[in-house]
Design a protein with these regions (language model features):
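A glycine-rich phosphate-binding loop feature that marks nucleotide/adenosyl-phosphate handling sites
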Residues: 75-78, 192-193, 235-246, 410-430
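Short, well-ordered alpha-helix to beta-strand connector turns
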Residues: 40-41, 196-197, 302, 329, ...
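Long, well-ordered, tryptophan-enriched scaffold segments
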Residues: 21, 34-195
Length: 651
């Protein structure tokens, strides 16, 4: 849903093999047809931001037609757990004097008794299994009253009942009216999904329409309803190899860090959270959270920023807001290898290195098995270019500002002036960590580390651990309050309901995200996405991208005919909320849903003044869709809206 599988290295080949060898069917749900849907796959064109309506309709069908795995829901999720009228969990402490606050109430469907379930911990506080009476037949469908610890009646329902009630209004017909996917297609898609071992990809990043966190939660719920969680062929947790790369770590909640050599240190007053975590506590990184602090100095002043290898103007929605923030800072330092637009705002540009110039051992991300790999420097930077690894630059800056901190926290106690010195220092730590990892494998199983080391030396990678299925949540817990998949989030119910999130994930579009375009008019959704060759911060400057890249704006022929616009025409796009304007050539194609425009991200609209070579003027062609965005951030999680709405005219 909303993802092209062609962009991530290896994913497309895995899908291609599955189709060829297993007959796997692939369905893409997207406002535009991605490259992966061009041959042998199905494309369901959906209105932007309405994925949640489709998902709730599919879940509603799965419940009504008994397609879901109800035994799995009763045993391995919080579906049978009781919740109050405000959807908060019913705990043992609420129903029994002296009861436990982390044990949750379920009703036995045979005896009618209320029983309590929770996670057992050993003396070290580690998970030791789920504390559940095996004879309990947890009731998914209970709704009624129970007696609390003070003898009062408490109205409750199971999380499943609340979930089903939330999905019930979403009939196939209602979802069709919202998504533009025919009702019959929705019904058939659901039946095929549940009867043919379906899995929904859990996405690449959720930054589209201001409702993405709940859409991804619904995607997870759909996978959970199949009952194939962490089972072969199902929605799984990847294995991990257990390889720890060289790094300096910092635990903000404890104000404590660890140097690359393992030495711990304490930061006085360091328990304070980063600003994005204050404003968006479940965020994994919301850069624009600092913008208000830059302007107002509250809750504390921010006067400088380092930007490391990030194409900020092609990543950060609302380009004008970003530019204003950068201009207001006293110091902007950019570490990069290419002339991205953010350099126009930099006081210092530090030329860094590229992965082809690095030496490192690491785990292989996003692979089902626990693999490790080596990256060996194939080249060095040119002799007349003082390019350095970002870590080298950071270490030297910290050494000059706080030499004692550099020594204590980074094990960097003197200036390193040459690349050979850096290799000896840093690569020495890299190799030491690798040798320790190999020795640890040999200690657990004689010869195993030697096998892995030989594999890596010969082919560049090795499988350390094959995926162990049936682990989560059967033997190990998830990081939820119950340790199980939660179809009604107890974290949201207890902490974030008043912040704009829903305990039961559901479809909605925030009013603030962007103005909804009028249908059959000159107003459109503007959506963006990547292709498989040119949409990245590096390849957008490659000479082949001049010919392989597409810097046009796609429009459906139905819309083109209505507006008198043809392929090759120049159009002006104007943001509905701000009036920001940009121009690009049009391509009429049935690969985008009517009422929406599509433009490749990380592709065109580079406005930098640093490029002097006229051979690269083509990078300025087209638009950057972030020019037109509101920059709306989801509450609590801080996800940005990359999609927006515009008005169009031919010029």
């Amino acid at each position: 849903m909303g993802r092209t599988l062609n962009c991530a290295i290896g994913v497309h080949s895995v899908v291609s093999r599955a189709r060829a060898e297993k007959g796997t069917r692939v369905v893409f749900v997207d406002p535009r047809m991605p490259e992966g849907a061009l041959t042998g796959s199905k494309w369901l064109a959906i209105r932007p931001g309405t994925d949640g309506a489709l998902l709730q309709a599919m879940l509603n069908i799965a419940i009504n037609e008994k397609l879901a795995n109800f035994d799995f829901l009763a045993k391995h999720t919080n579906a049978p757990y009781l919740v109050t009228a405000d959807q908060k969990p019913v705990t043992e402490a609420m129903l029994r004097e002296g009861g436990r606050a982390n044990y949750f109430a379920v009703r036995d469907s045979v005896t009618g008794e209320i029983r309590f379930q929770g996670m057992k911990k050993n003396e070290a506080g580690e998970f030791a299994g789920f504390d559940e009476d095996p004879s309990t037949k947890a009731d998914l469908y209970f709704a009624g009253s129970v007696e609390d610890a003070k003898g009062n009646a408490l109205e409750v329902k199971t999380a499943f009942v609340v979930f089903a009630e939330t999905c019930a209004p979403w009939t196939p017909e209602k979802a069709a009216s919202v998504t533009a996917i025919p009702a019959g297609e929705i019904v058939q898609l659901t039946r095929d999904f549940f009867t043919q071992g379906g899995v929904v990809d859990d996405g690449w990043y959720g930054s589209r329409n201001g409702n993405d966190s709940e859409i991804f939660a619904l995607i997870c719920c759909l996978n959970v309803f199949t009952g194939s969680l962490d089972r072969n062929g199902g929605f799984v947790v990847t294995q991990g190899a257990g390889m720890k790369s060289v790094s300096a770590s910092y635990a903000a909640d404890k104000g404590q860090g660890k140097s690359p050599t393992g030495k711990t240190w304490k930061q006085e007053g360091g328990e304070k959270k980063a600003l994005d975590k204050v404003l968006y506590p479940e965020s994994s990184g919301t850069y624009s959270a600092i913008f208000d602090a830059i302007e107002t100095g509250k809750p504390y002043p921010i006067r400088a920023t380092f930007i490391t290898g990030s194409t900020m103007f092609h990543r950060e929605a609302n380009s004008d807001r970003l530019a204003k923030a950068l201009k207001a800072l006293d110091l902007v330092v950019v570490q990069d290898i290419l002339p991205h637009e953010v350099m126009d705002y930099a006081d210092y540009v530090l030329p860094c290195t590229f992965f082809l110039e690095w030496h490192e051992y690491a785990g292989v991300k996003w692979h089902i098995n626990g693999n490790v790999q080596v990256n060996d420097a194939g080249i060095d930077p040119p002799a007349d270019c003082d390019a350095r690894e970002e870590i080298w630059q950071f270490c030297e800056i910290i050494r000059r500002a706080w030499p004692e901190r550099a020594a204590e926290r980074l094990s960097y106690d003197k200036e390193i002036k040459t690349r050979e010195e850096f290799k000896k220092w840093y690569y020495g730590m890299v190799d030491k960590a690798w040798n320790k990892f190999i020795a640890g494998l040999n200690e657990k199983k004689p010869g195993e580390g030697d096998r892995v080391a030989a594999d890596v030396a010969k082919q560049g990678w090795s499988c350390v651990k094959k995926k162990a299925f049936d682990v989560f949540p059967y033997k190990k817990p998830f990081g939820t309050m119950t340790g199980k998949p939660e179809i009604l989030s107890f974290l949201v119910a207890t902490k974030y309901q008043d912040k704009g999130l829903h305990p039961v994930p559901q479809y909605f579009i925030p009013k603030e995200v962007y103005q909804q375009p009028k249908p059959n008019s000159d107003e459109f959704y503007l959506v963006s996405g990547k292709d498989s060759s040119s949409s990245s911060g590096v390849s957008m400057f490659n000479r082949p991208t001049e010919f392989l890249g597409d810097r046009s704006v796609w429009m459906n022929p139905i819309d083109g005919e209505r507006l008198g616009i043809e392929t090759g025409d120049m159009i002006e796009l104007e943001a509905l909320h701000s009036g920001v304007k940009g121009r690009a050539k049009v391509k009429l194609t049935n690969r985008v849903i009517a009422g929406s425009l599509f433009a490749y991200s990380f592709s065109g609209g580079v406005r930098t003044k640093t490029i002097k070579d006229s051979r690269y003027n083509w990078v300025r062609e087209g638009i950057n869709s972030h020019w037109f965005c509101t920059g709306y951030r989801e509450p609590v999680v801080g996800g940005l809206s990359n999609n927006t709405s515009v008005r169009v005219k031919r010029v």
